[in-house]
Amino acid sequence: MEQKKRSSFSSRIGFVLAAAGSAVGLGNLWRFPYLAARYGGGIFLLVYLILALTFGFSLMITEIAIGRKTRLSCIGAYKALDKRFGFLGWLAAFVPFIITPYYCVIGGWVMKYLFTFISGNALEAADNGGFFSNFIGYDAGSLSSTIFSLNGPTPWFILFVLATTIVVIFGVEKGIEKASRIMMPILAILAVVIAIYSLTIPGAMQGLKYYILPDFSQFSVSTVLGAMGQMFYSMSLAMGIMITYGSYMQKENLLEHSVTQIEIFDTLFAFVAGLMIIPAVIAFNGGDPSQVNSGPGLMFITLPMVFDSMKFGTIIGAVFFLLVLFAALTSSISLMETLVSVLMDKAHMKRKTATIAITASCLIIGMLSCLGYGPWATITIIGMQFLDFFDFISNSVLMPIVALLTCILIGHVVGTKVIADEVKEGAGSFHREKLHRVMVRWVAPVMLAAILASELATKVFHLFTI
């Protein structure tokens, strides 16, 4: 009965756009350009492309096939494959439970910056970090005044959560698929427009050469680990999203072809994000690629200053933050949908009830990250603010563990033939079956263990050196 009642995307392109929208997020915009600049530009791009076509493809098609085969959310899907791995479904579901609240907080920051640029106050945002620090660290003296002030992050966080909720509550076809069909083409067009404009800035060609041309002398193990980590996080793997979206995929759709389209879109967007950002930032900093920083510092401090130095910078900045808003929304929608799907499957809730429940929990938990740089800044967990801690636990610990255990389950317990048979059901063939078998059984587990060890070693080293 569950399979008959389960919602589905109306077409393959609807599924591809929704899944690509999940993959295309803030990581593409603020982490990929930084890593490309740090690890030699062109050589990083080359390594990233190779890994996306092998490592990323194998993990993504595995998760989507699991979802389509079982027609269940991640908790039920893993248990359906092997009852001993039922715990893995809960672990996978816990990842978006942690990520969704703080991701919506950052989405609220984006809304604030978009409003700032649209209202003609872009100069305020270009003050080398002062505007950003005052905004996320806003403290009006009393908690109620801080929460309800537009000068602080909380109202913007709430607004972003509600925007995400509205899409999810309408369901798969009328909500997620329809929103993806609108936002993804606009996202692509805006990215190309900004990239083209960025390349017209005086001095941008030097940054373009650094970004495009491979320098093999800069190739190292760190380059591979950096590209592997970015590709892993970028593709929305190991958080139940692709399993959930796979469960909405129609059986007659070509699974391998769809995954190829998703990875092409995600990789192209990451590449264009680099074109938007790296040449402009390098030109702004007099040709120094080391000044391309990562995370919020790049998006909310460096780029507003770059826009301020441009002709028509206010307009370009507004267009950029609109692009970022769409990218953040398509990702937050997939995160929330994963949790809603779990409640619908396990607690037998109706979509509306499940969405309201997840929204409420998101607002409550997200308040920790929202106020973690302001009134609650003195409260830390192992030396980290709430948002940084949630990001570390989800991205650096849980996601590699979930992906590693998934590879063990598929590669050494139930067998890769389970995935291959599901892929062939819609197409009759699986062109990269041998690659998939080798990657999932042997190569991917080693890579994932390396990512986990690298992240933990970096954090432990940091803790003992502060």
Question: What function would you assign to each model-found segment?
Answer:
Residues 11-51, 246, 257-260, 264-267, ...:
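Transmembrane helix-boundary motif of multi-pass solute transporters/channels
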Residues 2-9, 13, 177, 181-329, ...:
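Membrane-embedded translocation segments of transport machinery
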Residues 1-30, 59-64, 68-80, 84-90, ...:
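Membrane-interface "cap" regions at the ends of multi-pass membrane proteins
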Residues 8, 14, 154, 265-271, ...:
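Loop-to-transmembrane helix boundary motifs in multi-pass membrane proteins
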Residues 36-62, 88, 152, 398-400:
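Extracellular loop-to-transmembrane helix junctions
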Residues 347-359, 391-448:
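C-terminal membrane-solvent junction of multi-pass transporters and transport-like membrane proteins
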Residues 14-15, 19-20, 49, 90-93, ...:
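Transmembrane alpha-helical segments of multi-pass small-molecule transport proteins
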